[in-house]
Amino acid sequence: MVRPRLARLVTSFVATGALVFSAATAAHATAIGSTPVRTFEYSVGGMTMKVPTGCMFTHAIRGSGKRITYQNAGVDCAFVAALSSGFCNWRIDFTYADTNNRTYRTSRGRTHSECKIDPMRNNSPQRLPRYGKACAHLVVNGVRRVSQCHHITK
């Protein structure tokens, strides 16, 4: 259990290092990108929860053209962040927008009431009607906290 999480964490840090200067990447066949989750606080049942620095939101996508064969997004935390209570009342949404940045499809994830340090979601294969971008969004306690996108191009 620790080994797969460690491998995913290392992969997300390597991908982040490679993509630090680009917010979105072209998804011709495979793309993976990570975005740091900023520190934030939220309230659950009267308790204040704090997510410290040290978590990355990673979005992976595979396919060709407007056809997505695999899509996954999740959070990996390290150091002090890995010891926190994690994310409560979370969900991961996938959105698809055209080249004018108009969102035309949303796959809303189920809201999970339990607290989890490593939330993750797979999405079903998609055939998109147009080029643009595919994004994954982490929503915690009803507030979008972090997003990661890939451009879908010819």
Language model segments and positions:
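Secretory targeting and sorting signals
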Residues: 1-29
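Short, exposed beta-strand-loop hairpins at the edges of beta-sheets
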Residues: 125-129, 133-153
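Short, solvent-exposed, Trp/other aromatic-anchored flexible loops in extracytoplasmic proteins
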Residues: 109-133
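Solvent-exposed serine/threonine-rich low-complexity stretches and specific carbohydrate-binding patches
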Residues: 100-117, 151-152
